[in-house]
Amino acid sequence: RHDPIDTCTLFLLMRTQVAYLGPKGTYAEQAAGALAKLEKLSEPEFIPYSSLMTVVEHLANKDCEAAVVPIENSVEGGVTATLDSLWTFQDIFIKRALILPIRHALISSGHTHEISEVLSHPQALGQCSQWLRENLPNAIQLPTNSTSEAVRMVKGSRFRAAIASKELSSIQGVNTIAFPINDVPGNCTRFVLLSNKEVPNDGSEDIASFAFSL
């Protein structure tokens, strides 16, 4: 005898779980939504994790069916945390790639002249380094796990600011005090959709990446 599965439970079981670097509002979430549409995933369920290593680890352990991670930025180059994760965990395959334009904002409850600390993901700090040198030369730069985490940490503080997207400013209810602040107007990041199932070769042109140690 088998217990019946109700319609709601069956629907949840059929959804494709997609891991990404959260929390909500990050560039990774935007990329995850776009890649899920390109891949034509049916009713994807997006699951945020606190670090890129954790995202790839959950995929490798088959806790989810897909993952979206940033792999390369046009200004800062390869995303080290992603590359290290792909080196650490075996049998991870790239299904699709997407280039997402990146436009950063300075977000704070204070004014620019009050800011003494700037928080963000290391990649975002690097992409705005020249702007920070020219406009906030004395501010201490503090790395966080994600741009969304940075905005949460500065909310309510007049001497702290975060670098993140304007969308996060609206989501978290914190003011945008400067935009755009990225050093390169054409700043963009390549995100990839990862799978723990081997991707069949359909005869189209592929891009191969090689990693080695000395």
Regions from the PLM with identified roles:
Residues I5, F11-L214:
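Domain-level signature for soluble enzymes in the chorismate/prephenate branch of the shikimate pathway
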